[in-house]
Amino acid sequence: MANPWWVGNVAIGGVESPVTSSAPSLHHRNSNNNNPPTMTRSDPRLDHDFTTNNSGSPNTQTQSQEEQNSRDEQPAVEPGSGSGSTGRRPRGRPPGSKNKPKSPVVVTKESPNSLQSHVLEIATGADVAESLNAFARRRGRGVSVLSGSGLVTNVTLRQPAASGGVVSLRGQFEILSMCGAFLPTSGSPAAAAGLTIYLAGAQGQVVGGGVAGPLIASGPVIVIAATFCNATYERLPIEEEQQQEQPLQLEDGKKQKEENDDNESGNNGNEGSMQPPMYNMPPNFIPNGHQMAQHDVYWGGPPPRAPPSY
Protein backbone atom coordinates (compact mmCIF):
# COMPACT_ATOMS: atom_id res chain seq x y z
CA MET A 1 0.00 0.00 0.00
CA ALA A 2 1.50 3.31 -1.08
CA ASN A 3 1.94 6.37 1.24
CA PRO A 4 -0.30 9.16 -0.04
CA TRP A 5 2.21 11.82 1.35
CA TRP A 6 4.90 10.95 -1.15
CA VAL A 7 4.62 11.54 -4.84
CA GLY A 8 7.06 10.21 -7.37
CA ASN A 9 10.47 8.89 -6.54
CA VAL A 10 11.81 9.14 -2.99
CA ALA A 11 15.58 9.17 -2.55
CA ILE A 12 16.59 8.50 1.06
CA GLY A 13 20.20 7.80 1.90
CA GLY A 14 21.08 7.30 -1.77
CA VAL A 15 18.42 4.62 -2.29
CA GLU A 16 16.02 5.25 -5.16
CA SER A 17 12.67 3.55 -5.08
CA PRO A 18 9.82 4.13 -7.51
CA VAL A 19 6.37 4.52 -6.10
CA THR A 20 4.39 1.46 -7.07
CA SER A 21 1.70 -0.60 -5.64
CA SER A 22 4.22 -3.25 -4.65
CA ALA A 23 7.12 -2.94 -2.18
CA PRO A 24 10.00 -0.76 -3.33
CA SER A 25 13.05 -2.51 -4.74
CA LEU A 26 16.59 -1.87 -3.53
CA HIS A 27 19.36 -0.65 -5.82
CA HIS A 28 23.09 -0.02 -5.36
CA ARG A 29 24.23 3.54 -4.44
CA ASN A 30 25.18 5.66 -7.40
CA SER A 31 28.50 7.29 -6.45
CA ASN A 32 28.50 9.47 -9.56
CA ASN A 33 25.32 11.27 -8.57
CA ASN A 34 26.40 14.66 -7.13
CA ASN A 35 22.94 16.00 -6.50
CA PRO A 36 21.97 15.95 -2.81
CA PRO A 37 19.01 13.88 -1.78
CA THR A 38 15.73 15.72 -1.84
CA MET A 39 12.27 15.12 -0.55
CA THR A 40 9.12 16.14 -2.34
CA ARG A 41 6.03 16.84 -0.28
CA SER A 42 2.60 17.07 -1.69
CA ASP A 43 1.40 19.53 0.98
CA PRO A 44 2.67 23.10 0.32
CA ARG A 45 2.44 23.98 4.03
CA LEU A 46 4.93 21.27 4.91
CA ASP A 47 7.26 22.56 2.19
CA HIS A 48 7.07 26.02 3.71
CA ASP A 49 7.86 24.70 7.22
CA PHE A 50 10.76 22.66 5.96
CA THR A 51 12.23 25.67 4.12
CA THR A 52 11.78 27.95 7.14
CA ASN A 53 13.52 25.50 9.48
CA ASN A 54 16.44 25.02 7.13
CA SER A 55 16.82 28.75 6.51
CA GLY A 56 16.56 29.67 10.25
CA SER A 57 19.13 27.24 11.59
CA PRO A 58 22.19 29.26 10.42
CA ASN A 59 20.77 32.38 12.05
CA THR A 60 20.29 30.57 15.33
CA GLN A 61 23.84 29.27 15.23
CA THR A 62 25.19 32.75 14.45
CA GLN A 63 23.23 34.27 17.36
CA SER A 64 24.57 31.67 19.80
CA GLN A 65 28.14 32.35 18.65
CA GLU A 66 27.68 36.11 19.20
CA GLU A 67 26.38 35.55 22.74
CA GLN A 68 29.36 33.33 23.53
CA ASN A 69 31.78 35.95 22.19
CA SER A 70 30.14 38.72 24.25
CA ARG A 71 30.46 36.59 27.39
CA ASP A 72 34.13 35.99 26.70
CA GLU A 73 34.76 39.70 26.17
CA GLN A 74 33.24 40.69 29.56
CA PRO A 75 35.92 41.04 32.29
CA ALA A 76 35.70 38.61 35.16
CA VAL A 77 34.70 40.09 38.52
CA GLU A 78 37.37 39.47 41.12
CA PRO A 79 36.13 38.31 44.51
CA GLY A 80 36.28 40.99 47.15
CA SER A 81 36.43 43.87 44.66
CA GLY A 82 32.93 45.03 45.62
CA SER A 83 31.99 45.93 42.02
CA GLY A 84 29.77 42.90 41.44
CA SER A 85 26.58 42.03 43.20
CA THR A 86 27.92 38.56 44.07
CA GLY A 87 31.37 39.82 45.16
CA ARG A 88 32.42 39.24 48.75
CA ARG A 89 33.06 42.20 51.04
CA PRO A 90 36.67 42.60 52.19
CA ARG A 91 37.32 41.63 55.77
CA GLY A 92 38.76 44.05 58.33
CA ARG A 93 38.79 47.82 58.41
CA PRO A 94 38.90 49.82 55.21
CA PRO A 95 42.17 51.62 54.54
CA GLY A 96 42.55 54.93 56.38
CA SER A 97 40.06 54.13 59.14
CA LYS A 98 42.56 53.46 61.91
CA ASN A 99 42.86 55.79 64.86
CA LYS A 100 45.02 58.67 63.81
CA PRO A 101 47.48 60.13 66.33
CA LYS A 102 45.95 63.04 68.18
CA SER A 103 47.74 66.32 68.53
CA PRO A 104 49.14 66.98 72.02
CA VAL A 105 47.15 69.20 74.33
CA VAL A 106 48.93 72.50 74.80
CA VAL A 107 47.94 74.66 77.75
CA THR A 108 48.14 78.23 76.51
CA LYS A 109 46.95 79.85 79.73
CA GLU A 110 48.14 78.80 83.18
CA SER A 111 46.10 79.12 86.30
CA PRO A 112 47.42 81.75 88.73
CA ASN A 113 47.00 79.26 91.60
CA SER A 114 49.16 76.58 89.98
CA LEU A 115 52.61 75.64 91.23
CA GLN A 116 55.64 76.19 89.02
CA SER A 117 58.83 74.23 89.54
CA HIS A 118 62.22 75.94 89.41
CA VAL A 119 65.83 74.86 89.57
CA LEU A 120 67.81 77.79 90.95
CA GLU A 121 71.59 78.10 90.85
CA ILE A 122 73.18 80.51 93.30
CA ALA A 123 76.61 81.79 92.36
CA THR A 124 79.70 81.57 94.54
CA GLY A 125 79.99 84.32 97.16
CA ALA A 126 76.27 85.18 97.20
CA ASP A 127 74.04 84.96 100.24
CA VAL A 128 71.69 82.01 99.73
CA ALA A 129 68.82 83.26 101.90
CA GLU A 130 69.00 86.83 100.59
CA SER A 131 69.07 85.62 96.97
CA LEU A 132 65.93 83.55 97.47
CA ASN A 133 64.15 86.44 99.20
CA ALA A 134 65.02 88.83 96.35
CA PHE A 135 63.80 86.31 93.76
CA ALA A 136 60.40 86.03 95.50
CA ARG A 137 59.91 89.79 95.64
CA ARG A 138 60.99 90.38 92.04
CA ARG A 139 58.70 87.70 90.63
CA GLY A 140 55.82 88.59 92.94
CA ARG A 141 55.31 84.94 93.87
CA GLY A 142 55.92 82.90 96.97
CA VAL A 143 58.89 80.52 96.93
CA SER A 144 58.78 77.13 98.64
CA VAL A 145 62.25 75.61 99.00
CA LEU A 146 62.15 71.83 98.64
CA SER A 147 65.83 70.84 98.74
CA GLY A 148 69.32 72.13 98.13
CA SER A 149 72.89 70.99 97.67
CA GLY A 150 76.29 72.66 97.66
CA LEU A 151 78.93 74.16 99.95
CA VAL A 152 78.49 77.16 102.25
CA THR A 153 80.74 79.00 104.69
CA ASN A 154 80.38 81.30 107.68
CA VAL A 155 77.00 80.06 108.85
CA THR A 156 74.87 81.73 111.55
CA LEU A 157 72.18 79.49 113.01
CA ARG A 158 69.42 80.02 115.53
CA GLN A 159 69.57 77.53 118.42
CA PRO A 160 67.58 77.93 121.64
CA ALA A 161 70.18 76.10 123.78
CA ALA A 162 73.02 78.45 122.89
CA SER A 163 73.74 81.66 124.72
CA GLY A 164 71.73 84.40 123.06
CA GLY A 165 69.99 81.79 120.90
CA VAL A 166 72.42 82.29 117.97
CA VAL A 167 75.48 80.20 116.96
CA SER A 168 78.08 81.40 114.42
CA LEU A 169 80.05 78.67 112.66
CA ARG A 170 83.29 79.33 110.80
CA GLY A 171 84.57 77.10 108.05
CA GLN A 172 83.16 75.22 105.11
CA PHE A 173 80.07 73.02 105.40
CA GLU A 174 78.15 70.81 103.03
CA ILE A 175 74.39 71.20 102.74
CA LEU A 176 72.54 68.01 103.71
CA SER A 177 69.00 69.36 103.71
CA MET A 178 67.39 72.72 103.23
CA CYS A 179 63.74 73.80 103.29
CA GLY A 180 61.77 76.94 103.89
CA ALA A 181 59.55 79.55 102.30
CA PHE A 182 59.79 83.19 101.22
CA LEU A 183 56.79 85.47 100.62
CA PRO A 184 56.83 88.35 98.14
CA THR A 185 55.44 90.97 100.56
CA SER A 186 57.51 92.57 103.28
CA GLY A 187 54.53 92.76 105.66
CA SER A 188 54.22 88.99 105.97
CA PRO A 189 54.73 87.42 109.41
CA ALA A 190 58.33 86.63 110.26
CA ALA A 191 57.42 83.08 111.26
CA ALA A 192 55.90 82.41 107.82
CA ALA A 193 59.19 83.07 106.02
CA GLY A 194 62.62 81.71 106.68
CA LEU A 195 65.07 78.96 105.90
CA THR A 196 66.01 75.85 107.84
CA ILE A 197 69.23 74.02 107.00
CA TYR A 198 71.23 70.98 108.08
CA LEU A 199 75.00 70.97 107.51
CA ALA A 200 77.86 68.46 107.75
CA GLY A 201 81.27 69.68 108.92
CA ALA A 202 84.72 68.59 107.79
CA GLN A 203 85.13 66.24 110.79
CA GLY A 204 81.70 64.60 110.36
CA GLN A 205 79.73 66.67 112.85
CA VAL A 206 76.15 67.56 111.87
CA VAL A 207 74.61 70.86 112.87
CA GLY A 208 71.31 72.42 111.96
CA GLY A 209 68.81 75.11 112.73
CA GLY A 210 67.11 78.16 111.36
CA VAL A 211 69.27 80.55 109.37
CA ALA A 212 69.67 83.72 111.46
CA GLY A 213 72.35 85.48 109.47
CA PRO A 214 74.30 85.38 106.25
CA LEU A 215 74.66 82.03 104.46
CA ILE A 216 77.49 82.55 101.98
CA ALA A 217 77.89 80.04 99.15
CA SER A 218 81.48 78.82 98.78
CA GLY A 219 80.55 77.09 95.50
CA PRO A 220 77.60 76.74 93.18
CA VAL A 221 74.50 75.98 95.26
CA ILE A 222 71.57 74.28 93.54
CA VAL A 223 68.12 74.87 95.00
CA ILE A 224 64.95 73.02 93.95
CA ALA A 225 61.94 75.25 94.60
CA ALA A 226 58.31 75.76 93.63
CA THR A 227 56.60 79.13 93.29
CA PHE A 228 52.96 79.85 94.10
CA CYS A 229 50.56 82.78 94.09
CA ASN A 230 47.39 83.94 95.87
CA ALA A 231 48.25 82.35 99.20
CA THR A 232 45.66 82.85 101.95
CA TYR A 233 46.62 83.47 105.55
CA GLU A 234 44.59 81.54 108.11
CA ARG A 235 44.85 81.72 111.89
CA LEU A 236 44.35 78.37 113.62
CA PRO A 237 42.62 77.11 115.64
CA ILE A 238 39.37 78.83 114.76
CA GLU A 239 37.80 80.53 117.77
CA GLU A 240 34.52 79.18 119.14
CA GLU A 241 32.71 82.52 118.80
CA GLN A 242 33.43 82.58 115.10
CA GLN A 243 32.22 79.00 114.75
CA GLN A 244 28.92 79.88 116.47
CA GLU A 245 28.39 83.11 114.54
CA GLN A 246 28.82 81.48 111.17
CA PRO A 247 25.99 78.91 111.60
CA LEU A 248 23.68 81.63 112.94
CA GLN A 249 24.38 83.81 109.96
CA LEU A 250 23.74 80.90 107.62
CA GLU A 251 20.45 80.05 109.35
CA ASP A 252 19.29 83.67 109.27
CA GLY A 253 20.13 83.90 105.60
CA LYS A 254 18.25 80.68 104.84
CA LYS A 255 15.17 81.81 106.78
CA GLN A 256 15.13 85.16 105.07
CA LYS A 257 15.48 83.51 101.68
CA GLU A 258 12.65 81.07 102.44
CA GLU A 259 10.40 83.92 103.55
CA ASN A 260 11.10 85.83 100.37
CA ASP A 261 10.35 82.74 98.29
CA ASP A 262 7.09 82.14 100.18
CA ASN A 263 6.01 85.74 99.68
CA GLU A 264 6.73 85.59 95.99
CA SER A 265 4.91 82.28 95.56
CA GLY A 266 1.95 83.60 97.62
CA ASN A 267 1.68 86.71 95.52
CA ASN A 268 1.80 84.70 92.34
CA GLY A 269 -0.80 82.26 93.67
CA ASN A 270 -3.15 85.03 94.75
CA GLU A 271 -2.88 86.72 91.40
CA GLY A 272 -3.63 83.47 89.57
CA SER A 273 -6.43 82.30 91.91
CA MET A 274 -8.38 85.54 92.36
CA GLN A 275 -12.12 84.88 92.12
CA PRO A 276 -14.91 87.35 91.45
CA PRO A 277 -16.70 88.59 94.58
CA MET A 278 -19.50 86.39 95.83
CA TYR A 279 -23.02 87.68 96.50
CA ASN A 280 -22.05 91.12 95.13
CA MET A 281 -19.88 91.74 98.20
CA PRO A 282 -16.76 93.89 97.90
CA PRO A 283 -13.49 92.00 98.41
CA ASN A 284 -12.52 94.05 101.51
CA PHE A 285 -15.85 93.49 103.25
CA ILE A 286 -15.35 91.90 106.67
CA PRO A 287 -18.54 90.41 108.15
CA ASN A 288 -18.73 90.44 111.95
CA GLY A 289 -15.28 91.89 112.23
CA HIS A 290 -13.66 88.84 110.56
CA GLN A 291 -12.72 88.15 107.01
CA MET A 292 -14.75 85.47 105.29
CA ALA A 293 -12.62 82.49 104.39
CA GLN A 294 -12.81 80.96 100.98
CA HIS A 295 -13.70 77.51 102.28
CA ASP A 296 -16.74 79.03 104.07
CA VAL A 297 -18.01 80.36 100.79
CA TYR A 298 -17.27 77.38 98.53
CA TRP A 299 -18.04 74.54 100.94
CA GLY A 300 -21.36 73.83 99.16
CA GLY A 301 -19.88 73.80 95.70
CA PRO A 302 -19.89 76.51 93.07
CA PRO A 303 -23.16 78.38 92.42
CA PRO A 304 -25.26 77.25 89.45
CA ARG A 305 -24.78 79.02 86.20
CA ALA A 306 -27.36 81.53 85.04
CA PRO A 307 -29.63 80.34 82.22
CA PRO A 308 -28.63 81.59 78.80
CA SER A 309 -30.46 84.62 77.52
CA TYR A 310 -32.46 84.02 74.35
From Swiss-Prot:
Main subcellular localisation: nucleus
Region (Disordered): 15-112, 239-310
Record GO terms (molecular function): minor groove of adenine-thymine-rich DNA binding
Transcription as UniProt keyword: yes
Name of the protein this chain belongs to: AT-hook motif nuclear-localized protein 15
InterPro entries registered for this protein in UniProt: AHL15-29, PPC_dom
Composition-biased stretches (Pro residues): 301-310
UniProt keyword annotations, A-Z: DNA-binding, Immunity, Innate immunity, Nucleus, Plant defense, Transcription, Transcription regulation
Biased composition (Low complexity): 94-104
